[in-house]
Each structure stands twice: as structure tokens, then as C-alpha cells.
Amino acid sequence: MSKRDYYEVLGVGKSASKDEIKKAYRKLSKKYHPDINKEAGAAEKFKEVKEAYETLSDDQKRAHYDQFGHTDPNQGFGGGGFGGGDFGGFGFDDIFSSIFGGGARRRDPNAPRQGADLQYTMTLSFEEAAFGKETTIEIPREETCETCSGSGAKPGTKPETCSHCGGSGQLNMEQSTPFGKVVNRRVCHYCNGTGKQIKHKCSTCGGTGKVKKRKKINVTIPAGVDDGQQLRVAGQGEPGINGGPSGDLFVVFRVQEHEFFERDGDDIYCEMPLTFAQAALGDEIEVPTLHGKVKLKVPAGTQTGTKFRLKGKGVANVRGYGQGDQHIVVRVVTPTNLTENQKNILREFAEVSGNMPDEQEMSFFDKVKRAFKGD
């Protein structure tokens, strides 16, 4: 019959401390001791608890058990050498990984590491994106706990060097292979690879050394930013780990649409209405731009769709490469609801032009009947 997991037997997790393992053993040994518990199977359970405790309370045995479980790494190599037996619960991948360094090349858990980057989405008006601005934003991020100065330990105490790994954050485990014994390095499960153990945790941060706070950051938005672009604010991300540098803050811009202007890169586009008289006779009109009103001369005979350009009236290039232009497309508006006098003037114009229109007024139903008759 296969043996139960020792951690399961004692009812503790795999990262349990020695004190937690000892406490669990005392409770269960008292419960199942043959002199106290006369139920059938109690003696076997007591034996199982004792065996689990003897293994997990010994650092070397525990490390060996964590590596191999209940399997004996030497089994399968008795008198027959390689013949017929298995390799003690591990495969050739594990063997070669250990021998040739695959398992040893691990990042030092105590090495300085850069903090995580943060992202903040900012909504800008059309004009704010065009001209830029200075603003203050507030972001939630982790800060060093002021109570413990980031140590994670209760004030008046300090983290202690892990007695199991000597502060390295790693344990050396001896592994038997068909090629001999190999020493493999694993993350120390007593300190989770930190090399430190905190016996008395800070009540403010719970031992993490960090607390969540909202921080105000001044941001200078350059002129010419566009929708979807982002601004990097160096060093304003999450704080570094083990003395490493802080991460960065990335501000992503969302630019609102304008009711009159449209933007394409650094250029601005808009439509301007012209009356029939303005288009035919020409005129000087006022055109709104981001920089104020500008006079534009419209030549006589201008047609719908004619384009004009106002140089330098667009958006500044965000990288400083000049200034965009403003493009104007004119639309000639056909007059409606004419007075009789206006109609007479247009009739005169049409007659002089030799293009007198047919002004027969028909009802909608008359037009439908005429269409069916083919008139």
C-alpha cells in the first residue's frame, strides 16, 4: 500500500515551519497514542504520525523527502547495475539537468530587481492634446512601509538570517544518479528564497515591507500628443525589490473628438460652408483655427469640394519636427425657402445665362403618374 504524504499526515503545508510541524505532531501523537486511544487503527496512525515527524523535523531528511518523496533514490541499482530497474523516481531529463547545470542556473532571489511598471489612462480634450499642458495625477501604488522602514519586521526587531540556508535563499540537495551523486540547488522553502526570516511581523504591512498608497505625480504633457500615444515617466512605477530601481509609469492618452475639427497626424481638417453668391462672386471669409480666426480669400467660381491650405495652422509635431497645416474643404450650400423676389432674381439670372429651368409645379402623385406614363 502506498504511503500518505507526510505533510498530509501532519495536516500542515509544505512551507510549514519547524514549530508548526512540532505543534501538529504533539497534537496528533496525543490523539492516537495507544495508551490513550484504544480504537482499532489508532496504533497504526500513531506510527504514521511518528514516522512523518521524524522525517520532517530533520532538515536533511526533509530536504531529501521534498526532492524524492517516499522513493528511495538508490533503488534499481543493486547488483544488476542499470539492468531492469528504474531510476529512483526521476528521469534522464532531471539527471542531465542537474549534471550539466540546468537546475543550478537560478536567479539569485536576493539580487536587486526593478519594480513593476504602472499604467495610467488620461483623457484629454482636442485642444489639450494639441497644445499640451501640465497636470497632477494621483495613482495607487506600493510604497515602503514607514512603520518598519521596509524591513517587514515589528519595530524594535529585525529580520533574522535564515538558519537553514545561511541567508543564501537556496538549499543544497544531494541527489543520487546513475553517474554518481550530484548536488542540486533549490529555493529554500523555509524563507521562500529571501534568505531572511521574520519572527515578529510588522502590524502595518503584515511583514511585506510595503503598503498601498495614492501618490500625486506632476506630469508635463507635450504639445502634439495623439490618441493612443503614451508618455513614460521614469522611476514612478512600483518600488524596486532588494534595493533595485523603481519601475516606470506609462501614461496612455485618450483624445476626445472635436465638433468641428478632425485630425490626421499633425494636420487639421475642417469643412466651411459657402453661399451660392460667395462661391460665384468670391469673398473673404473667416476660418476658425486652433490658433484663432484667420481670413481666407475665396476666389470667384469656387466649386464644392475645393480645398485650401493654411500653412502652419495645424498641430505641433510631438517630437519637435515642425508644425502641421490646416486643410479646408468648402461646401456650397443650396438656398432653400426662397422668397418670390429671390426666385425672380434667379429666373433673370437663368434667362441671361440661357439656361431657363422648367418650373412646373406638380404634386407628388402627379410626378408618380407621369413617371408611369413615360412622359
From Swiss-Prot:
Binding-site list for Zn(2+) 2: C162, C165, C188, C191
Coiled-coil segments on the chain, per record: none
Pfam family, one: DnaJ_CXXCXGXG
GO cellular component: cytoplasm
Cellular compartments annotated: Cytoplasm
Entry cofactors: Zn(2+)
One Gene Ontology term of the molecular function aspect: zinc ion binding
Zinc finger (CR-type): 132-214
Subunit architecture: Homodimer.
Functional summary from the UniProt entry: Participates actively in the response to hyperosmotic and heat shock by preventing the aggregation of stress-denatured proteins and by disaggregating proteins, also in an autonomous, DnaK-independent fashion. Unfolded proteins bind initially to DnaJ; upon interaction with the DnaJ-bound protein, DnaK hydrolyzes its bound ATP, resulting in the formation of a stable complex. GrpE releases ADP from DnaK; ATP binding to DnaK triggers the release of the substrate protein, thus completing the reaction cycle.
Name assigned to this protein: Chaperone protein DnaJ
